[in-house]
């Protein structure tokens, strides 16, 4: 029996993708298989996220919970990867000497070598370098068992927003060559994948080298993926307003496989706060992108990110954000109270707003967006929606669920044979975060 691997993943879809790649490479090169619990494992990996406050303390807390396992299993290895590893580096081993491996998002492909070096030398191994796109050359071909898959097309971020730690933990923007991405997507299609989600910190900043030496922008990549047989839906996340080009907007007119949903983080509706955040656009420019998108795809769904309580945010600034929500009619949001990230410019800004005021603003914003979402969902009742059936419902395993083109989850009475298929569903009711439906007579 081979040795076992346990991975705990925190944070974004990029981390989910990276964790899957860790498992793939350790299966391919070390013959490891996944364990369901840390107690079963011979290697425990924490793939961490540093976006939120106290992320580092959360990691050390979780490390402390598995430390005792080494008492009964001396050969057990414990590793920390992801953005906290990149940010903290050797400090992790200083605070937790029982940690064996520390590696960043760009060095996960070196895990087999790090494991070998740890066993050979008996010393902890730390590698948080930024070897650009090398990791994709070392990773085994993508494997999947479902009808949906993530595909990372670029790494890092070069925008340096004043509040964000990502450029320091994942490095500058580096795009995979066009043919590498297309080969991965085509391979997934052969395995039965029908929907791909393209990933990147600023996915629409993609600039991939082509075989002829030219550079493919994000719209060109979408054109090529659209032609791959078997792929019926294309999603992507996360996009940046500064990179939302006219060519990308036009893609929504000519590419029917490109879903009718865009996640386009705005962060604030105040131009003064946007400037302090160093976002590089105004609210007028943001609304112009949305208006042009709706001209070519009138029913497109727009979701966003908001940071509440950025240093210096006044009530007028917050009201400007609420007005932007009214103007755009956002469908969904990921909204948080600002938390300073060490080493970022915004961490040094004075902050005189009380936590209670920030909480009140956050609740008001979330309530407004929830009302928008409910109104949009209510408008879908009695319509027929095409969904990709993903499998049993999380809340009720006796039911099944799928996702609409505009990213709504629909629960319905079905059977396992529908999993991985596109079906037509008549929407019958709206719940707080999902829709209910029944298989349409039009099937």
Curated annotation (Swiss-Prot):
Coiled-coil stretches noted in the UniProt entry, renumbered to this chain: none
Name the top EC class.
transferase
Q: Which PROSITE patterns match?
A: MTTASE_N, MTTASE_RADICAL, RADICAL_SAM, TRAM
Q: Which amino acid positions bind [4Fe-4S] cluster 1, per UniProt?
A: 12, 49, 83
Name the principal localization, coarsely classed: cytoplasm
Is Iron one of the keywords UniProt gives this record?
A: yes
Which Pfam families does the record cross-reference, listed alphabetically? Radical_SAM (PF04055), TRAM (PF01938), UPF0004 (PF00919)
Q: Which PANTHER family match?
A: CDK5 REGULATORY SUBUNIT-ASSOCIATED PROTEIN 1 (PTHR43020), MITOCHONDRIAL TRNA METHYLTHIOTRANSFERASE CDK5RAP1 (PTHR43020:SF2)
Q: What does this protein do?
A: Catalyzes the methylthiolation of N6-(dimethylallyl)adenosine (i(6)A), leading to the formation of 2-methylthio-N6-(dimethylallyl)adenosine (ms(2)i(6)A) at position 37 in tRNAs that read codons beginning with uridine.
This protein's name: tRNA-2-methylthio-N(6)-dimethylallyladenosine synthase
- Organism expressing this protein natively: Nitrosomonas europaea (strain ATCC 19718 / CIP 103999 / KCTC 2705 / NBRC 14298)
- Which gene name does the record give? miaB
